[in-house]
Amino acid sequence: MTRKVAIYGKGGIGKSTTTQNTAAALAYFHDKKVFTHGCDPKADSTRLILGGKPEETLMDMVRDKGAEKITNDDVIKKGFLDIQCVESGGPEPGVGCAGRGVITAIDLMEENGAYTDDLDFVFFDDLGDVVCGGFAMPIRDGKAQEVYIVASGEMMAIYAANNICKGLVKYAKQSAVGLGGIICNSRKVDGERESVEEFTAAIGTKMIHFVPRDNIVQKAEFNKKTVTEFAPEENQAKEYGELARKIIENDEFVIPKPLTMDQLEDMVVKYGIAD
C-alpha cells in the first residue's frame, strides 16, 4: 500500500532539501519507489532529484492548455533512480491564490491516476506553516495520512512546528492524519538536540531523526544533486539513509498536543533559544 506523506515546517528550514534527500535515500539505500509532489509556487521541491528546475509547472500547463488536455506524461518527470516528480507551481505573481493551485494540482493528479499502487511513498512538500486551506489540503482532505515536521533548535522553527500541530489537531479527526515525528534539521545552535527532544515529548511525539549540519549538502545542491547521488559514500548520505529507514519502520502516528504560548516561552527561556 502506498504511504502518502506530507512534509511541513517553517519557511527556510530546509523542507525541500530534507524531502528530496530522504526520497533519494529511500530509493538508493532501501530500493523504494517514490513520487515527490512539490506544493510550493517556487517550484524548487524537485530540482535536486531532476538536476534542475522543470521548465514548466503543472499550473503553467493548466493555463496554457487547460486541465482537461493535460496528461501524466506532460507533467511527471523522472529523475534520480526513476523518482517521479511533479511541481504544482502557482499563479502569475500578484494574481490569484497559490493555495488554490495546490488544490487544483493534487486533484488533477488524482483524476489522472498519477499516484499508482506500485509506489511505496508519495511525498507532498508543502509551503511553510499551515497558513491557508490550500496548503493544508494534503492533511485537510486526507490526501496524506502521515505528517513529518522539519524543525531545528531555533525559536521560530519551534514556534512554527507548534502552529503546524494546531492545524493537525483541527484536521486529524476528519482526515485520519497523524504526526509521525519531528525531523531536526540541525542549525548547530546550543542545546539543539535537547530542546527539540523536550518539545517533541511535550507535544506527544518523537524526534524521528537528528540530521547533522554538513557542508556536503550545500556542495551537492550547487551541483543540482541530492547528497545520495552526489556523494553516497559520505556520512551525510548515510544519515539520510537512516532517516529513510526510520520512516519506513515508523508505525506511531499521533494527534499532537500543541503547547500554549506560556509553555513555549518557558522552554525558550530554559534553553536560551531567544538569546
Swiss-Prot record:
NCBIfam families: nifH. Its cofactor is [4Fe-4S] cluster. It is an enzyme of class 1 (oxidoreductase). It catalyses: N2 + 8 reduced [2Fe-2S]-[ferredoxin] + 16 ATP + 16 H2O = H2 + 8 oxidized [2Fe-2S]-[ferredoxin] + 2 NH4(+) + 16 ADP + 16 phosphate + 6 H(+). One of its GO terms (molecular function) is 4 iron, 4 sulfur cluster binding. [4Fe-4S] cluster binds at residues 97, 132. InterPro entries: NifH/chlL_CS, NifH/frxC, Nitrogenase_Fe_NifH, P-loop_NTPase. The modification ADP-ribosylarginine is found at residue 100. GO terms for biological process: nitrogen fixation. Binds 1 [4Fe-4S] cluster per dimer. Disulfide bonds: none annotated. Belongs to the NifH/BchL/ChlL family. It comes from Azotobacter vinelandii. The gene is anfH. This is Nitrogenase iron protein 3. Homodimer. The key enzymatic reactions in nitrogen fixation are catalyzed by the nitrogenase complex, which has 2 components: the iron protein (component 2) and a component 1 which is either a molybdenum-iron protein, a vanadium-iron, or an iron-iron protein. The reversible ADP-ribosylation of Arg-100 inactivates the nitrogenase reductase and regulates nitrogenase activity. This subunit is associated with the iron-iron nitrogenase component 2 (the third type of nitrogenase).
